[in-house]
Amino acid sequence: MTDSIAATINTRANVYFDGKCVSHGITLADGTKKSVGVILPATLTFNTGAPEVMETVAGSCSIKLAGSDSWQSYGPGERFDVPGQSSFEIKVEGEPYHYICHFG
């Protein structure tokens, strides 16, 4: 899938968790910030500053929000919300998980 948009792309990758998560930051013409990335099979914990919406592009994952005891699963075309100043665990098994993260 490809989209044509007016944006500035940070061509230097953000590499986290010894390369298990790699993303690129994008700033749209209106100042909106996003990142596009991939998470390889692993269970990782992310902290958030601003609220985030994680949009699944390919692959699947299970997530557990801070304060929750239950895991929720998401696949292509599905999204989940993460509150700001919080955290979430994400579990990827099998195929890599491709995502778009919408900030704010």
Curated annotation (Swiss-Prot):
UniProt family annotation: Belongs to the nucleoside phosphorylase PpnP family.
Catalytic activity, reaction form: a purine D-ribonucleoside + phosphate = a purine nucleobase + alpha-D-ribose 1-phosphate; adenosine + phosphate = alpha-D-ribose 1-phosphate + adenine; cytidine + phosphate = cytosine + alpha-D-ribose 1-phosphate; guanosine + phosphate = alpha-D-ribose 1-phosphate + guanine
Alphabetical list of Gene3D superfamilies matching this protein: Jelly Rolls (2.60.120.10)
UniProt keyword list: Glycosyltransferase, Transferase
UniProt GO cellular component terms: cytosol
Enzyme Commission code: 2.4.2.1, 2.4.2.2
Entry GO MF terms: guanosine phosphorylase activity; purine-nucleoside phosphorylase activity; thymidine phosphorylase activity; uridine phosphorylase activity
UniProt cross-references to PANTHER family, sorted A to Z: PYRIMIDINE/PURINE NUCLEOSIDE PHOSPHORYLASE (PTHR36540), PYRIMIDINE_PURINE NUCLEOSIDE PHOSPHORYLASE (PTHR36540:SF1)
InterPro entries: Ppnp (IPR009664), RmlC-like_jellyroll (IPR014710), RmlC_Cupin_sf (IPR011051)
Enzyme class, broadest EC rank: transferase
Gene field: ppnP
Matching HAMAP family: Nucleos_phosphorylase_PpnP (MF_01537)
Function, as annotated: Catalyzes the phosphorolysis of diverse nucleosides, yielding D-ribose 1-phosphate and the respective free bases. Can use uridine, adenosine, guanosine, cytidine, thymidine, inosine and xanthosine as substrates. Also catalyzes the reverse reactions.
Alphabetical list of SUPFAM superfamilies matching this protein: RmlC-like cupins
Keyword Transferase belongs to the record: yes
Keyword flag Plastid: no
Protein's name according to its UniProt entry: Pyrimidine/purine nucleoside phosphorylase
